[in-house]
């Protein structure tokens, strides 16, 4: 069973929390989602209230180190997600970036221009079904 690290914005904005929950449910068909809490609709932009930042950092780095693949939703820019992607790249962990193009949300050149990242553009969560079958099988 694959260990999947899902990355998405928390403190950078929770506008996509419902989408994250749907993506995480789809990913669970292919393995253990280490960061399943990102789909928690009660998680606010303040993050995990009871946990200190250093605890969250250390825990997430440990999860990253054990991951077989990183799947990230990068439409909503996030410093934390960018850091996680760079860390995963340094560890030679495959990175997939899911992105919904729109007139007001442009993908960072640091993501789009990185040949080590697999960027997949989509519009609806249903568009991910075939893509996930392809990358996990």
Language-model features, listed with the residues they occupy:
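Conserved catalytic or regulatory cores that recognize and/or transform ribose-phosphate-containing ligands
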Residues: 1-137
């Amino acid at each position: 069973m694959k260990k999947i690290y899902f990355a998405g914005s928390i403190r950078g904005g929770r506008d996509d929390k419902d989408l994250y929950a749907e993506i995480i449910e789809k990913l669970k068909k292919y393995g253990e989602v280490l960061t399943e809490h990102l789909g928690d609709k009660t998680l606010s932009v303040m993050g995990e209230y009871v946990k200190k930042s250093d605890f969250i950092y250390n825990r997430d780095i440990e999860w990253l180190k054990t991951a077989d693949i990183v799947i990230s939703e990068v439409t909503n820019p996030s410093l934390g997600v960018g850091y996680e992607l760079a860390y995963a790249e340094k560890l030679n962990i495959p990175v997939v970036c899911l992105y919904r193009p729109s007139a007001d949300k442009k993908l960072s050149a640091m993501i789009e221009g990185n040949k080590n990242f697999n960027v997949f553009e989509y519009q609806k969560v249903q568009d991910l079904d075939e893509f996930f079958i392809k990358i996990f099988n």
